[in-house]
Amino acid sequence: MSYILVVDDEKDIRDLISQILFEEGHTVKLAQNSTSAIDYINREEPDLIVLDIWLKDSEMDGIEILKSVKQNNPLCPVVVISGHGNIEIAVAAVKQGAYDFIEKPFNTDQLLLVIDRALETSRLRKEVYSLQNKEINESKMVGGTGAF
């Protein structure tokens, strides 16, 4: 299935999300702070990131990690979670490129629905991007402009 990185400073939350996703057939990596999250992201390029906004004892908060992810891998969907949910946080996360926002405590069905939608949307975006690049390359090979 998919490689998903879960970033949360709370071990119980990381373990719960990991178990849910593992049971759905996903490969899951865990990070408890911004340093380990950025390290995983730079080494392995996850298919999706589940990211807590408030990371205690971290150099970066979730919004800063989100900005970094979107600069380096704009097609990677990020689902933001927070136990301190308010509309301002959700709006800020979506403005920075988050796919969706889930408030803790969440229910399993909600989490899986959002993750499945995010993965499918990402797959379709990558497919469109690939087809566009293929068309551009074919157009260059025949010396055309791609226009009819």
Language model region names:
Residues 9, 104, 144:
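A Lys-centered signature of the CheY-like receiver
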Residues 39, 61-75, 92:
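Short amphipathic alpha-helix used as the core "switch/output" element in two-component signaling
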Residues 8, 52-54:
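Active-site residues of response regulator receiver
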Residues 132-148:
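AAA+ ATPase active-site-proximal loops
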Residues 30-48:
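Acidic, metal-coordinating helix/loop segments flanking the phosphotransfer/catalytic sites
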